[in-house]
């Protein structure tokens, strides 16, 4: 049964975004410009923040909302009452099953329309979440049946971007990270829990095939670093060819991508925000496409930015492509030149275009609801 709370004579559609990540976090980084660009004549945008951290990105994000509420210390019933008092038409969960999530609220029908977006790479399994925002590369038609939500298909990549993101105005050098200028640098800045034995086997094979190469990873903790070094030794790879860099501000982190030659994605849980960062920085990324949401995000980004040739279908294909590119300087340079052009021309980093398409989706589902129509798959062209 549709829950008819929307009033047809409202001047604006009221959108409520719920997140614990309105800060210098992957979700905050990806959504900030989308929130800023929303058409405030058509939409009232309200933020519901489930954390107490406030940083430079929180300040920027808060300015994009007409109202901003910290719900960290509010029980569910209070949050539900607040959203009803504010007349929220569409509630959007940006967390899913992630840290400090309030996704449990979405098990209740507290808003007329409820959407899962961006934070969790898969179905929520919650019957009161009506829609999931995706794209055709991410969820092919044959896979719709595995989702409890109806799919809102955006025309390009489902992932928003921040074209205004800050990058430090400072030259970085490889020597700062214990990397030599003449080394071929593969990198993977995905978090350590995405690195499994099979993908590490691939990396070892690639390192073995490419002399004077290293793989550059992000520090997580001493235990994971020790384990990865040990796994390298077991595969007869010099552990010094596994190089780690410390966590730092997003502004400096993005700059570091420019020091690498080629990004090697993980599988089956691939790069999401890190893929966005790499491509934005001009660094090509090789991925393996799978069937699950989390194994198709990087493929969606690569397709949108016109680099489908970097999408592989197997571990063997992934290894061979990485080795082939690393051995062929001219081919790598050609890929990087195409990427540089496509950063400017493809829809991936055109935030205004992205926002307009998402708003078309919001208007579409809002009008369907007002016409007493049940949620259905939505295709935005």
Label the predicted regions.
Residues 1-178, 191, 201, 230-236, ...:
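Alpha-helical solenoid repeat scaffolds of the TPR/TPR-like class and their adjacent stem/linker regions
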Residues 95, 265-271, 289:
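Short Ser/Thr-rich beta->loop micro-motif in glycosyltransferases that lines
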Residues 11-14, 180-187, 213-214:
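Charged active-site motifs of nucleotide-sugar-dependent glycosyltransferases
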Residues 105, 206, 277, 301:
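Hydrophobic/aromatic ligand-binding patch that stacks against planar heteroaromatic rings
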Residues 264, 278:
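Donor-sugar nucleotide-binding helix/loop cap in glycosyltransferases
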Residues 295-306, 311:
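Short acidic/histidine- and often glycine-rich active-site loop of Leloir-type glycosyltransferases
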Residues 42-46, 204-234, 239:
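A conserved nucleotide-sugar
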Residues 279-280, 284, 303:
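Short alpha-helix at the nucleotide-sugar/activated-sugar donor binding site of glycosyltransferases
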